[in-house]
Amino acid sequence: MTSFQEVPLQTSNFAHVIFQNVAKSYLPNAHLECHYTLTPYIHPHPKDWVGIFKVGWSTARDYYTFLWSPMPEHYVEGSTVNCVLAFQGYYLPNDDGEFYQFCYVTHKGEIRGASTPFQFRASSPVEELLTMEDEGNSDMLVVTTKAGLLELKIEKTMKEKEELLKLIAVLEKETAQLREQVGRMERELNHEKERCDQLQAEQKGLTEVTQSLKMENEEFKKRFSDATSKAHQLEEDIVSVTHKAIEKETELDSLKDKLKKAQHEREQLECQLKTEKDEKELYKVHLKNTEIENTKLMSEVQTLKNLDGNKESVITHFKEEIGRLQLCLAEKENLQRTFLLTTSSKEDTCFLKEQLRKAEEQVQATRQEVVFLAKELSDAVNVRDRTMADLHTARLENEKVKKQLADAVAELKLNAMKKDQDKTDTLEHELRREVEDLKLRLQMAADHYKEKFKECQRLQKQINKLSDQSANNNNVFTKKTGNQQKVNDASVNTDPATSASTVDVKPSPSAAEADFDIVTKGQVCEMTKEIADKTEKYNKCKQLLQDEKAKCNKYADELAKMELKWKEQVKIAENVKLELAEVQDNYKELKRSLENPAERKMEGQNSQSPQCFKTCSEQNGYVLTLSNAQPVLQYGNPYASQETRDGADGAFYPDEIQRPPVRVPSWGLEDNVVCSQPARNFSRPDGLEDSEDSKEDENVPTAPDPPSQHLRGHGTGFCFDSSFDVHKKCPLCELMFPPNYDQSKFEEHVESHWKVCPMCSEQFPPDYDQQVFERHVQTHFDQNVLNFD
């Protein structure tokens, strides 16, 4: 019966494609059309094909020829489609007497449809025709060929034969089964007693096996309890490790933030320190340049002084001559009056008039010379103003160049800071990636341990079930042995049929028990193997956990090292702050020390100028009115603030120059003289006044020297000194140095007053506490840089 049921299942796949109008024979060399229908059970594909196979094919490769199945147009899934293929005649087989059939093959190589067999035969003479009545009792005659009729009969007989053969085979199978059952039951009857003995022996063995299984079960329970406890411990360890990793990560993030802040502060402090150093160097250079320019200007002013002194001496000489001539004229007028009173001689009057005319011509010539000299003096002043303006423009250009240089330095610093920031970002990214990797590994280990724990629980349940089943089987086996004895006693009086039925009932429990024992033993073996595998995996996981703990310890050590590095950088930053504070203090002290000599010089200038004017005014008998304002410095103090700085960046404005005080005119010719001099104090610094010059100012000589006598007689309000020279003065010890003294040696002398640390070369001001300085030096030896208590 099974063969009849399997046939439609096997042929069901071949009905997905149905071939229509298949003839029994075709001509060998003629074109052949193949009509087929695609059912909803198949989905067409462009790589599907239809082949001509010999009957008896085994695989899809046994085709004779094939054509690709075209994809139907406007195809809708779940619908039936009719298709046509045309095979060319020269691809078809010859008349060989073999049977062929069409087969539809998918792109996967599956055959989903097959046609009825057919042959390729050449045309033959007209066969004999036969007439036969219709089977439907319709009183109609059907004309067929003899061969067709014979084929129909053969097909019917073949079908009947196949059905009969199938029935015979089924009956033979049934008889064979019945005979086998009879023989088996007879054999079972003969061997039943022997089996009872064997079962009793097996029962004893099973009792021993159950005891051993109980012992093994207890051992497995102990192992399971140990494994569960270890799993709990491992889970707790994993939780603690994860908490520690999270804490370390938070600490690492906070340390990174602190490190970034410290680096940022350090960079800011370094930038400030560099800018202050650059400003200090610029100020030094500016001071050197100003000193050089001052020396040049002093030399130029000295030359101008000499020129002015010569011109003024000539002017005073001419003024004295004019005064003498006026006195002579007055005397002559008096004489003329007296002479006119005494004598009225015309000749004398003509002579006197002619002398008067000559004297007036001389006076006019002297006036013209005075005007010419005044013009020359004004030209010299204009040239000096132009040189000052050129100097101012040069200084402005120099400042522009300095600003450009500062901008370039700032850009370089910014680029360096960006590079450092990129390096720190990459390092932080790598550390974060490593921490994430550690987290993933810990999570995977925790999941693996959970799975192992669940498997252990499952195995424990299976062991409990097996122990319960073994106990139940023992009880059932004892009951069945008693029933077996009763059945054996009753089977003697029964017929063979009933005995056969009882035999069928009795041996089934024993076979089931034996099978169950075998299954239980196999399960126990499998469980032991699984437990061994689990223990191995557990040991491996334990080893992995130890490795992860070691890695965590390594990362903790690295974090500790990072903390130490960060602390060292913080110490360095604090040292930099201290150095910067000390540099600022030193800068302020230098500023004060440089301002104090400037104030002293200004006080000396203010104290000297009134004395000079006083001496000149006392000699003439009248008091001069002087302004109390301080003189405007030509280049200003570079270390002073912008508001209190004298002068505007070295610019020299002629309109702001303090003019000399106006004297009471001694005669009318002085109003026409054009003379402008700056109100700068060209006297020497404190303590450098020449004693001979002061004596000459106090003691007026009695010799009738016309130029000098006229200068001291009228007083111009200037204290010119041709022997003036600039000296260098130490701002700390006030030691004087000649003007041509080397600048580097002068700076070395000034720096020698400072206290220098022999370890770090850090400078301290001269008034710095000696104990604090010694404590700073000792900090380099006890490895505590920040110990300034």
Swiss-Prot record:
Q: Which InterPro entries match?
A: CALCOCO1-like, CALCOCO1/2_Zn_UBZ1, SKICH, UBA_autophagy_assoc_protein
Instruction: Give binding positions for Zn(2+) 2.
Output: 757, 760, 776, 780
Entry's localization field: Cytoplasm; Mitochondrion; Preautophagosomal structure; Cytoplasmic vesicle, Autophagosome
Q: Spans of biased composition, class Polar residues?
A: 481-502
What are the coiled-coil residue ranges? 144-599
Tell me which residues bind Zn(2+) 1. Answer: 730, 733, 749, 753
Per the record, what about its domains? The C-terminal UBZ-type zinc fingers function as ubiquitin-binding domains.
Positions of UBZ1-type zinc fingers: 727-753, 754-780
Q: Which residues carry this modification: Phosphoserine?
A: 124, 138, 225, 593, 609, 666
Region ranges (Oligomerization):
320-420
Where is region (Disordered) located? 481-508, 639-660, 678-712
The answer to whether keyword Coiled coil applies is yes
The entry lists its GO molecular-function terms as: kinase binding; protein-macromolecule adaptor activity; signaling adaptor activity; zinc ion binding
| Result after altering residue 777 to S | Reduced affinity for ubiquitin
Alphabetical keyword list: Apoptosis, Autophagy, Coiled coil, Cytoplasm, Cytoplasmic vesicle, Host-virus interaction, Immunity, Innate immunity, Metal-binding, Mitochondrion, Phosphoprotein, Repeat, Zinc, Zinc-finger
A biological process (GO) of this protein is:
negative regulation of apoptotic process
User: How is this protein annotated for GO cellular component?
Assistant: autophagosome; cytoplasm; cytoplasmic vesicle; cytosol; extracellular exosome; mitochondrion; phagophore assembly site
Its PTM note reads: Phosphorylated in the C-terminal region by CHUK/IKKA leading to NF-kappa-B signaling down-regulation.
* Protein purpose: Ubiquitin-binding adapter that participates in inflammatory, antiviral and innate immune processes as well as selective autophagy regulation. Plays a key role in the negative regulation of NF-kappa-B and IRF3 signalings by acting as an adapter for the ubiquitin-editing enzyme A20/TNFAIP3 to bind and inactivate its substrates. Disrupts the interactions between the E3 ubiquitin ligase TRAF3 and TBK1/IKBKE to attenuate 'Lys63'-linked polyubiquitination of TBK1 and thereby IFN-beta production.
Assembly and interaction partners = Homooligomer. Interacts with TNFAIP3. Interacts with STARD13. Interacts with MYO6. Interacts with TOM1; the interaction is indirect and is mediated by MYO6, which acts as a bridge between TOM1 and TAX1BP1. Interacts with MAVS; this interaction induces MAVS polyubiquitination. Interacts with TNIP1. Interacts with TRAF6; this interaction mediates deubiquitination of TRAF6 and inhibition of NF-kappa-B activation. Interacts with RIPK1; this interaction negatively regulates RIPK1 ubiquitination. Interacts with NBR1. Interacts with TBK1. Interacts with RB1CC1. Interacts with SQSTM1.
Q: What's the protein here called?
A: Tax1-binding protein 1
Primary residence: cytoplasm
Tissues of expression: Expressed in all tissues tested.
What changing residue 775 to A does, per the record, is: Normal affinity for ubiquitin
